Amino acid sequence: VGIDVGGSATKIAAFREDGRLMSPLFVRATDPVTSVYGALGRFTAENNVRLEDIHSIMVTGAGGAYVGEELYGRPCVHVSEFESVGRGGLYLSELNRAIVVSMGTGTALVYAQSGEKSEYLGGTGVGGGTLVGLSRLLLGMEDLSHVADMALSGDLSHVDLMVSDITRRGDKLGLRQDMTAANFGKVSDIASKA
């Protein structure tokens, strides 16, 4: 069982002994300890797994530091988040070498190569946490599913500066005219009225 105790959510995934992936679980959380115990209990119930059948639990993520050496009596192994991101990216992509982008509360770039230690290349604080914070401040909403529904009915060209707004030759540059050139570019002081 692998558990990522992140800044805003706890994610759990595991494989059955025959190699089949169990139904993963994603739980929003503010308290890492409560989150990990509740999420693991729910995960085992939803996947019809007994705690005795879990050999070990791999724990990673910022909140993983709050998890001890065992969880519900099962041994825990703490793993570097960037190593987890790198190995997981290679597994999912079926590549031997890749730059893996992990988009969570923030965003991290990790270089991974089979048989080698993964390397953190850098990152940004812009991620899901940014979207949640902006949604709360600007819209008074925290539920991203509602924000996503609103976004689907919106029109980016009313707020974003598009390639077509700055050049008619975007296609000559390999850019589609309807691509965003600058997020929120039409709502800045220097932008013309949209």
Descriptions of predicted regions:
Residues 136-194:
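Active-site rim beta-loop-alpha module in soluble metabolic enzymes
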Residues 1-4, 54-58, 98-102, 123:
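Short glycine-aspartate micro-motif
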